């Protein structure tokens, strides 16, 4: 799933490219030693305090460190279906989004295709429109994204989402009309909305009930 120019995973370490005010770009490394998460800022020259705090917030969201693991375990282990899986893999957390907009675009790219194909499309999108960075919403809003090799409806959905976020008509924050606004976009269905609620909004009640893999496992 990793985008080569933006992120990498190796030896229990996640590396992410980040935009920095004073030097353009840098890399942060997040490592797990079995009991603690460590963030290495050594490749972020002249990083500001605000930028450092923002990165820490993103790391907490991505790795779901605020989840009350013990309480979650206690509730799920009592379930007749989930209990067995909880015993097999205790302490699993829901991975969050480093960037909500990026995750939304990648969710649409991933509709009805394999993970490998979705990653291939996302990599092409970064190369063609972002020059190695994930393209800004304003840039994607005026692109014919389908030219990368996907159904036109899906490409138009990405452009519509990018335009809506850029113009402020859409948001990626919890709001009573979140699902209503996103479902009104052609090419956005319940799976995408529930995925965003789960990964971006960190909604504990979100569940992609119509996901093919989930249905197969259940």
Can you annotate each of these PLM segments?
Residues 1-218:
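HhH-family (HhH-GPD) DNA N-glycosylase catalytic core used in base-excision repair
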